[in-house]
Amino acid sequence: MSNKLIYSGKAKDILATDDEDVIVAHYKDQATAFNGVKKEQIVGKGVLNNQISSFIFEKLNAAGVATHFIEKISDTDQLNKKVKIIPLEVVLRNYTAGSFSKRFGVEEGIALETPIVEFYYKNDDLDDPFINDEHVKFLKIANDEEIAFLKEETRRINKLLSDWFHQIGLKLIDFKLEFGFDKEGKIILADEFSPDNCRLWDAEGHHMDKDVFRRGLGELTDVYQVVWEKLQAIK
């Protein structure tokens, strides 16, 4: 199998395989926050993120969500379909938290009557700015039909995820998704789903996600291990 490095990101390396339509995602032990301003090597993080994301993507595939995930092939690696990533972070918020609370001057933890979908332009140089539908079209990132699909699919995924996490006593506060075009030009879910790109709170309001690292609240891998163990109880 070819192992040529295609791309090195903050949390993952993307490697080529002998099949031009398939890549390997290698999960690193690196933790970052604030667009890479805060950075630390945390042993075991890559294994946990790969386990959690593989588990979630397998369940999403089984539920009929089209994703890039093929299979987990080692503790830190998984096979994915190669996609052309859409340069958008699609964020869904079920509760107020993080940048949303800061932007609108509201306390964290308020349940939103209707989940809110937001777009952020994937551009590190610009610090991934918050943009609206018209900006998305102006930048020729997606058209009206594609924007509608991204929102609808994100809401569908939210219903599945929220139910699964509710089963294990965790609130899905918010999360970030990325999508891409497969070789047929179909939009499918890509990237990962782990505590790196979502907020999870337990019944006491404790953070069970990367906010533990962002805010210096404890050992990240201890929290991720608890999430991983809880996930085993999902039906």
Swiss-Prot record:
Its annotated pathway? Purine metabolism; IMP biosynthesis via de novo pathway; 5-amino-1-(5-phospho-D-ribosyl)imidazole-4-carboxamide from 5-amino-1-(5-phospho-D-ribosyl)imidazole-4-carboxylate: step 1/2
Provide the protein name: Phosphoribosylaminoimidazole-succinocarboxamide synthase
Name its GO BP terms in alphabetical order.
'de novo' IMP biosynthetic process; cobalamin biosynthetic process
Q: Which UniProt keywords apply?
A: ATP-binding, Ligase, Nucleotide-binding, Purine biosynthesis
What is the enzyme's class at the highest EC level? ligase
Q: Which PANTHER family match?
A: MULTIFUNCTIONAL PROTEIN ADE2, SI:DKEY-6E2.2
Gene name linked to the record:
purC
The disulfides recorded in the entry are none
Annotated source species: Streptococcus gordonii (strain Challis / ATCC 35105 / BCRC 15272 / CH1 / DL1 / V288)
InterPro entries given for it? SAICAR_synt/ADE2_N (IPR028923), SAICAR_synt_PurC (IPR033934), SAICAR_synth (IPR001636), SAICAR_synthetase (IPR050089), SAICAR_synthetase_CS (IPR018236)
